[in-house]
Design a protein with these regions (language model features):
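Rossmann-fold NAD(P)-binding glycine/threonine-rich loop
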Residues: 274-298
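Conserved small/polar residues in nucleotide/adenosyl-binding loops
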Residues: 2-8, 296-303
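N-terminal ligand-binding/catalytic initiation module
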Residues: 3-142
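A structured beta-alpha segment of the ubiquitous adenosine-cofactor-binding alpha/beta core
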Residues: 103, 221-262
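Accessory "access/gating" subregions that flank catalytic or transport cores
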Residues: 241, 256-281
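General beta-strand structural signal in soluble alpha/beta enzymes
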Residues: 94, 120-123, 144-147, 178, ...
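Glycine-rich phosphate/diphosphate-binding loop of Rossmann-like nucleotide-binding domains
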Residues: 71-75, 154-241
Length: 308
């Protein structure tokens, strides 16, 4: 897998002789240290802080693989760093924390924050991720962004709006089922509601979310139960998707069966985004009568699996 390795660190300063070395390191570095001490904002002038981002995880919710730990999450963080550099020109560094609690993650990020111009939180399980982002946003003086929530929600909203144009439906009129209301799913629901969606049904592994559900609800799901499901449906995912115009999955592979998809409304739309394998394959969805399908792309994943 040597050729798959995604990162290296290169110097922008050529150390060609002893004078250059003494400028890059001691004693030359003493002067910018003095300047920054006198004016802390000069750290953006004299260091790489302003163009660097920390991509931080604790490995508790990596892709659809679950709690696989910080080491196993490192390839994902490296990949995200590639995206920052290739598409944004921003230098990013993967930070994989051996920290299982929200307090440990928050303390670790606060401790390393002086080095970076921004924090990208990644693959941290819910509901801890909500509190972690909120506290870091409140206490740090640099941007904090939880990609699983907000990045995913932005892209899904754009995709749903365009898919609805294709099938000739309006966001405010359609029934949307969101399966897997974790970090990404919750943010997607919030974004869709702000955009005008009025009938969203959230479903987790225990079934449809509604107030007072016997299976119980985590704090964020308790809130979701009050702001979604206006018809107060109960039951399973199969019950939720019956007559639905849009299915949005951020759950697990195979969650949406062909039989379920066949009960959706005419010209249905499916976003099968379980990672790395989708809730339903596109051929199966199309065979069930679904009009538009967006799904997790498998080709690179399968190629890498063969390399391993």
């Amino acid at each position: 897998l040597g050729d798959v390795y995604k990162r290296q660190v290169n110097s922008l300063f050529e150390v060609k002789d002893r004078d250059a070395l003494s400028t890059a390191y001691t004693p030359g570095v003493a002067e910018p240290c003095r300047q920054i001490k006198a004016n802390p904002d000069d750290v953006y002038k004299y260091t790489f802080k302003g163009r660097t981002v920390a991509v931080v995880t604790n490995g508790t919710a990596v892709l659809g693989l679950g709690n696989i730990g910080p080491e196993a999450g490192l390839p994902v963080m490296e990949g995200k760093c590639v995206l920052f550099k290739e598409f944004g020109g921003v230098d990013a560094f993967p930070i994989c924390l051996n920290a299982s609690t929200r307090e440990e993650v928050i303390a670790a990020v606060k401790a390393i924050a002086p080095t970076f111009g921004g924090i990208n939180l990644e693959d941290i399980r819910s509901p801890e991720c909500f509190d972690i982002e909120a506290e870091l946003e409140r206490d740090l003086d640099i941007p904090v962004f939880h990609d699983d929530q907000h990045g995913t929600a932005i892209i899904v909203l754009a995709g749903v709006l365009n898919a609805l144009k294709v099938v000739g439906k309006r966001l405010e009129d359609v029934k949307i089922v969101q399966n897997g209301p974790g970090a990404a799913g919750t943010a997607i629901i919030k974004m869709l509601q702000v955009a005008g969606a009025k009938n969203i049904v959230a479903v987790d592994e225990h079934g449809i979310l509604y107030p007072g559900r016997p299976a119980g609800l985590a704090d964020h799901k308790e809130w979701l139960a009050t702001v979604t499901n206006p018809e107060r449906l109960t039951g399973t995912l199969a019950d939720a998707v019956r007559g639905a115009d849009v299915f949005i999955g951020t759950s697990v592979a195979g969650a949406l069966t062909t039989e379920m998809a066949a009960t959706m409304a005419p010209d249905a739309i499916v976003f099968a985004m379980a990672n790395p394998n989708p809730e339903i394959m596109p051929d199966a969805a199309k065979a069930a009568g679904v009009r538009a399908v967006s799904y997790t792309h498998l080709r690179a994943h399968e190629t890498l699996r063969h390399l391993v």
